[in-house]
């Protein structure tokens, strides 16, 4: 007898062993048709999985997040099947699920074209309609290796060769196509109905640039056409908001081949940068931070002591002078410890919060560079807090308050939080880890925040909290971090005199709110579609005259606004007013002031918003009050 317990607490009793599909059939025909897989004692399995002992079972349908992931995984196999049918001789490699879709890497004699993608997607639809049964089989390792070698799939054979000898290998077949996979998968290809191939890119085998270049085909799959259409519309909107396009359109910045991964900031873009930096500088000072500046080039010996030379050297720019090796700093922490070490520290000095807008360089692969989002030269809003173990909770709590306020002021209302706990390989005592993890969790709970644990994902030197923003398109951007460090202070000789007159090593909290200034500005541009809030806009007001008669009056208003601290300019060209309004609205300038004979006579201005809002006529003084209130509130 086999007892299967369902999520509602009811039991289904069977005389013998039973498959997951048979359990679904025993409940209702509708559920049996809808079921895609099962979660047996917490593990995802196929509908064909045999239940031999008393078990807990959750049936997975396309209404579950796991169901959508299984559909996408199966769609990756559908893609590989279609490619193999259309392009014999192609070798398949790996095809995982990613956020909002999947990809599959292929080795083929020529590059795939956009026309090929259309043909592949059409063949995928045909295979879906064949309603092929998807079957799992388990072979021993040697049989699986020989099978894939015999059919010319040498990449698959390599993957299996890396699997331990005694571990069985699972394969999935649909029609005459067989692939290596752990599963689970949908029961029939007809369950994969809504999908679209998106693009082709290059990818190295096993992610190693020393290996051969493969072709990666990206796709997306959904439960319904409505969901897919919404996603595609979102992508379309994201394309319009691409910070690289808007950066050019709004004359904010550019990059060029002579300085890959490094940004040329134009006057308007640098105004945005300065506004953010000034705001952060004032905010940090108001929260007990002191600002420092540390060298960008440091001797190899310091990087060896910190551990970066051993673990991070391939990402560092190295130079040599007078028979000494140096590295341009990829991060600021070793330099901050040197400032802490300069002079005798007492427990009375703690917590000490050292902040720096630190310029860093990392030797990122050229293929990974992407506008402002992935660069080689960047500035971090970095800070390190040196404190005692007993001060961790208080410092974490204060940092969370600070971070939340900053994000709100930049227009982000939703933050996702993850706590990464101790990994298997780590430094520090169990007691230290217990205290640190408890302090981080307690701080999050005291703030009544929703958060999730990432077990074992902490760094070897301490647990961390990650803060991820959601933008106006629902995309996620991991920006803020708070990282405890039990290792670096000791490695670099940091210490303080405790209350009992003994020397102790401080706890070091690495923390950032924006992350990289460059990346955060890119996120802001896309979040606001280039229409930055008034306080951040490089140009806040443009004054437009209708004819030459008002040119002098328009210039007078411009000067008056500038004297009031408003970033204003005038367009006195002899062009139609409708043309000038359209042009400056495209430049995302928040306020457009129109002056004609009537406004000049009444000593007023007619105010329009960049999105076409009509605020009517008002005095310059009234507008200044309105604008200054908006700037102060950071709206």
From Swiss-Prot:
The GO biological-process annotations, alphabetized, read as: threonyl-tRNA aminoacylation
Principal EC category: ligase
* Listed Pfam families: HGTP_anticodon (PF03129), TGS (PF02824), tRNA-synt_2b (PF00587), tRNA_SAD (PF07973)
Chain residue ranges for the region called Catalytic: 242-533
Provide the alphabetized UniProt keywords: Aminoacyl-tRNA synthetase, ATP-binding, Cytoplasm, Ligase, Metal-binding, Nucleotide-binding, Protein biosynthesis, RNA-binding, tRNA-binding, Zinc
Location of this chain's protein in the cell = Cytoplasm
Q: An example Gene Ontology cellular component term from the record?
A: cytoplasm
Entry's cofactor comment: Binds 1 zinc ion per subunit.
Q: Which Gene3D superfamilies does this chain map to?
A: 3.10.20.30, 3.30.54.20, Anticodon-binding domain (3.40.50.800), Bira Bifunctional Protein, Domain 2 (3.30.930.10), Threonyl-trna Synthetase, Chain A, domain 2 (3.30.980.10)
Q: Which InterPro entries match?
A: aa-tRNA-synt_IIb (IPR002314), aa-tRNA-synth_II (IPR006195), aa-tRNA-synth_II/BPL/LPL (IPR045864), Anticodon-bd (IPR004154), Anticodon-bd_dom_sf (IPR036621), Beta-grasp_dom_sf (IPR012675), TGS (IPR004095), TGS-like (IPR012676)
Task: Give cofactor(s), names only.
Answer: Zn(2+)
Using the record's annotation, list all stretches that form the TGS domain.
1-61
State the reactions this protein catalyses: tRNA(Thr) + L-threonine + ATP = L-threonyl-tRNA(Thr) + AMP + diphosphate + H(+)
Q: What is its EC number?
A: 6.1.1.3
What PROSITE patterns has UniProt attached to this entry?
Answer: AA_TRNA_LIGASE_II, TGS
Where on this chain does Zn(2+) bind? 333, 384, 510
**GO molecular function terms here?**
ATP binding; metal ion binding; threonine-tRNA ligase activity; tRNA binding
Q: Does the record bear 4Fe-4S in its keywords? A: no
What does the record note on quaternary structure? Homodimer.
UniProt family annotation: Belongs to the class-II aminoacyl-tRNA synthetase family.
> What task does this protein carry out?
Catalyzes the attachment of threonine to tRNA(Thr) in a two-step reaction: L-threonine is first activated by ATP to form Thr-AMP and then transferred to the acceptor end of tRNA(Thr). Also edits incorrectly charged L-seryl-tRNA(Thr).
Q: What is this protein called?
A: Threonine--tRNA ligase
The record lists the organism as Nitrosomonas europaea (strain ATCC 19718 / CIP 103999 / KCTC 2705 / NBRC 14298)
Q: Which gene encodes it?
A: thrS
């Amino acid at each position: 007898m086999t007892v299967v317990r369902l999520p509602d607490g009811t039991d289904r009793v069977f005389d013998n062993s039973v498959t997951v599909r048979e359990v679904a059939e025993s409940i209702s025909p509708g559920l049996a048709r809808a079921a895609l897989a099962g979660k047996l004692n917490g593990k995802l399995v196929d509908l064909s999985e045999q239940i031999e002992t008393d078990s807990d079972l959750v049936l997975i349908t396309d209404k579950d997040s796991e169901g959508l992931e299984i559909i996408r995984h199966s769609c990756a196999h559908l893609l590989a099947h279609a490619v193999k049918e259309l392009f014999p001789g192609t070798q398949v490699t790996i095809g995982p699920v990613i956020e909002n879709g999947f990809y599959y890497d292929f080795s083929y004699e020529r590059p795939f074209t956009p026309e090929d993608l259309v043909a592949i997607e059409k063949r995928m639809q045909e295979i879906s309609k064949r309603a092929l049964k998807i079957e799992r089989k388990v072979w021993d390792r040697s049989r699986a290796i020989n099978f894939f070698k015999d059919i010319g799939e040498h990449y698959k054979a390599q993957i299996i060769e890396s699997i331990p000898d005694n571990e069985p290998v699972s394969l999935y077949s649909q029609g005459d196509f067989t692939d290596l996979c752990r599963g689970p998968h949908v029961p029939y290809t007809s369950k994969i109905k809504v999908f679209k191939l998106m693009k082709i890119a290059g990818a190295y085998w096993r992610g190693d640039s020393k290996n051969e270049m493969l072709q990666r085909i990206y796709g997306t799959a959904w439960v319904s056409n409505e969901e897919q259409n919404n996603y595609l519309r979102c992508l379309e909107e994201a394309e319009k908001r691409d910070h690289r396009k808007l950066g050019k359109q709004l004359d904010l910045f550019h990059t060029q081949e002579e300085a890959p991964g490094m940004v040329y900031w134009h006057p308007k873009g640098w105004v945005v940068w300065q506004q953010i930096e000034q705001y952060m500088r004032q905010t940090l000072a108001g929260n007990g931070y002191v600002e420092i500046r540390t060298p960008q080039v440091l001797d190899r010996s310091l990087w060896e002591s910190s551990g970066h030379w051993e673990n991070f050297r391939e990402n560092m720019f190295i130079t040599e002078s007078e028979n000494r090796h140096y590295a341009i700093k990829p991060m600021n922490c070793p330099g901050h410890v040197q400032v802490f070490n300069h002079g005798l520290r007492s427990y009375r000095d703690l917590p000490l919060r050292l902040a720096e807008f630190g310029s860093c360089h990392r030797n990122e692969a050229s293929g990974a560079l992407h506008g402002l989002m992935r660069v080689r030269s960047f500035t971090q809003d970095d800070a390190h807090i040196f404190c005692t173990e007993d001060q961790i909770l208080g410092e974490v709590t204060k940092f969370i308050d600070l971070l939340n306020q900053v994000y709100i002021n930049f227009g982000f209302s939703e933050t996702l939080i993850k706590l990464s706990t101790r990994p298997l390989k780590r430094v520090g005592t169990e007691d230290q880890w217990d205290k640190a993890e408890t302090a981080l969790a307690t701080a999050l709970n005291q703030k009544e925040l929703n958060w999730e644990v990432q077990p074992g994902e902490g760094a070897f030197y301490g647990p961390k909290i990650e803060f991820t923003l959601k933008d106006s398109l629902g995309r996620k951007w991991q920006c803020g971090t708070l990282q405890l460090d039990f290792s670096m202070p000791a490695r670099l000789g940091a210490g303080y005199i405790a209350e009992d007159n003994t020397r102790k090593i401080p706890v070091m909290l690495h923390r950032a709110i924006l992350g990289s200034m460059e990346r955060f500005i890119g996120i802001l541009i896309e979040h606001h579609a280039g229409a930055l809030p008034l306080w951040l806009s490089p140009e806040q007001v443009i004054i437009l005259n209708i004819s030459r008669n008002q040119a002098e009056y328009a210039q007078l208003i411009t000067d008056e606004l500038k004297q009031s601290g408003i970033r204003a300019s005038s367009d006195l060209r002899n062009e139609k007013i409708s043309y000038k309004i359209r042009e400056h609205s495209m430049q995302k300038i928040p306020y457009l002031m129109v002056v004609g004979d009537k406004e000049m006579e009444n000593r007023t201005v007619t105010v329009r918003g960049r999105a076409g809002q009509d605020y009517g006529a008002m005095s310059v003084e009234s507008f200044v009050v309105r604008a200054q209130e908006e700037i102060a509130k950071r709206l």
